[in-house]
Amino acid sequence: MGDEGKKEKRRQTKEDAVYGFVFESDSNSDDSGGSRRKKRRKTKPVKFSSAGNIDQVLKQNRGNCKIDENDDTILPIALGKKIADKAHVREKNNKKENFEKFSGGIGMKLLEKMGYKGRGLGKNQQGIVAPIEVQLRPKNMGMGYNDFKEKNAPLFPCLNKVEEKKKSVVVTVSENHGDGRRDLWKKKNVRKEVYITAEEFLGKKQEEGFGCDQLIIDKRGPQDRVVNSLRNLYAEEKATDANVQQPELQHNLRFIVKSLEHGILKTDKDLRNEKGLALSLQQEKEKFKMGVKKQKTLFDNLGYVAEEIDRIEVEIASGNLTLDSLANRFKDLRSSYPDDYKCCNLSCIASSLALPLFIRMFQGWDPLSDAEHGIEAISSWKMLLEVEDNQSISTPYSQLVSEVILPAVRVSGINTWEPRDPEPMLRLLETWEKMLPSLIFETILTTVVLPKLSIAIESWEPRLETVPIHFWVHPWLPVLGQKLESAYQIIRMKFGNLLDAWHPSDVSVHTILSPWKTVFDAASWEQLMRRYIVPKLQVALQEFQINPADQNLDEFNLVMGWVSSVPIHLMTDLMERFFFPKWLDVLYHWLCSEPKFDEIMKWFLGWKGTFPQELSANRRIEIQFKRGLDMAREAVERMEMSQPGARENISYHKAQEQRQSEGRAKVQAQVDDPEELSFKEAVELFAQEKELLLKPKPHRMHNGLQIYRFGNVSVLLDSANSKLLAQEEGRWFPVDLDSLLKMHYSAVTGKQ
């Protein structure tokens, strides 16, 4: 008994060393873990097991004891048995403490029996269900550290609805079903590591879009946070949970990951840039290849063109080449090598080669007598030499025309052309207008036609010449246009000299003046009529006598002949002031003598018919005729007639007599005392008397005074000092009017 009563120390077998307490519990399932091993009963027979049975048992034990690589709930040593038993005891105690939580305690049952449904207190159930929920902060954690959440799980989840409570109980029981010892040592929320390659990462970024990250500022916490996308908005919150240990280490890991991501993105960006650079270099290489090929083709073409030009020069030197054949040779070159023709400016070479042939063709040409000479040759070369889309002034064709055509036209226009015979020059310009460049055409007008025409206008004498000036000036209006404005001033001055001594009986003046109504501007024409024509017509109407018995209408018809030329308001004013007062007065006296009304009506209608339509349709003229008709009606009805204009004419005649007397006095004063005229007016009057022109020179000043042209002499009018200065040999000296006139005649004689 002594030896058998002792506790025999159990030896560790090979299976215990391999399988631990699991194998022990299986082999000693009949005994308790700490009990003494029973004695062997030697009376029973020995049992033998075959090798196959032993292997089967070992395999079964190994299969039952297989541990998952990711399962950390069971310790691989025998010590874990005691630890697991203690953990199982703690779990039972926790279940007892939370019994009311999962089974619905007596307090909740009593409240339910009294009608409480788990909602807020109050009539409208507006009270809070749970009291203020608090949560203990971890040790040494300040306010706002790692976005710590102040509010976590509800303090009393048992206050939920009964249905939710029952459901939660079922779920809780089902979740806690099984062996608690194994669940206690299992890691919860195991994070599986996910590995991605650089290609997968770049593919993911490509789906999101490179460079499309938005800068998002999160202001929900005590401190602002900057995130790149909404995907990462809650990433840091999860990473900085209060239950997570070592946030600095996790921050460093995230920093390393982000650095790797940035490195991958930078490498990918550099790779894409290098690929783009390689592609652009390849394209540039192809471009250079095409340029080299094009230059080689151009070089070959230029060699052929140079050889062709050398052959053309040899043929020209031998005299075997004409203008037509030369033009055909260059047309072939332009059609065969259009790019080379334009690039090398072969039109200039063609123009230089054709110039001697054109000079030979137009040698001795008279443009005024034979305007169409050589126009066909010029037309063919115009198409060959003109460069398309060339806005420059100097072109090969314009240079050719300026050296061949322009000199001949200039010589013929200056030496041969007579301005009073405009047809030859007009025919020449009309024939060559389409062939001449616009610049050369304007040069001919400004340097040949206009100066020659201006000299002819200045030398025109309207009293001596029988051909009106508009015969040889008006044909140039469509061609010269506004360039004749300076000549119009000279023509108006010539008209003024002519009209000073004009009488209305001279109908030739109307023939000379009327064509210029549409040429001069309205203000200049009205001024000319008011100054020279209207006063003479006024005198004619004043001298006109109205006699029903023996009426002479010659003077009246002379006045009516100017209706189309004189502005209508001036002519109406003349008739109201100087014709109708006489006419109404004669009608009044005739009606007072008991006449025959048939004769009066015939006389009335006859006078009305003598007025031109444009004048009789005027409202003011109609009023005057209506006054005469009213007088006749009063006489027929035996009504008392008032003398026409009795009251108005008294003041009118007085005012008229006063104006006439003042006018005569003014004229007499000017004759008696010429100093009443301004200094400039006196010089102008002297120039008009001598039929000379006094006009300012545009943009010519000397010591602040305008320089005028008196005939052929340059003068200065110093009105402040009443001095007249003339220029001779570059010097200015004072002169009188007679000396100035002698200087003009001397200049004319010197030119002749």
From Swiss-Prot:
PANTHER family reported in the protein's UniProt record: TUFTELIN-INTERACTING PROTEIN 11, TUFTELIN-INTERACTING PROTEIN 11-RELATED
Residue span(s) of domain G-patch: 103-148
Disulfide bonds: none
Phenotype upon loss of function: No visible phenotype under normal growth conditions.
Cell compartment(s), UniProt: Nucleus
Comp. bias regions, Basic and acidic residues: 1-17
Entry function: Involved in pre-mRNA splicing, specifically in spliceosome disassembly during late-stage splicing events.
Lineage: Eukaryota, Viridiplantae, Streptophyta, Embryophyta, Tracheophyta
GO molecular function: DNA binding; protein serine/threonine kinase activity
Protein name (Swiss-Prot/TrEMBL): Septin and tuftelin-interacting protein 1 homolog 2
Motif Nuclear localization signal, residue range(s) on this chain: 36-48
SMART domains (UniProt xref): G_patch
Family per record: Belongs to the TFP11/STIP family.
InterPro entries: G_patch_dom (IPR000467), GCFC_dom (IPR022783), STIP/TFIP11_N (IPR022159), TFP11/STIP/Ntr1 (IPR045211)
GO BP terms, alphabetized: protein phosphorylation; regulation of auxin biosynthetic process; spliceosomal complex disassembly
Region (Disordered): 1-52
Keywords, comma-separated and alphabetical: DNA-binding, mRNA processing, mRNA splicing, Nucleus, Spliceosome
Biased composition (Basic residues): 35-45
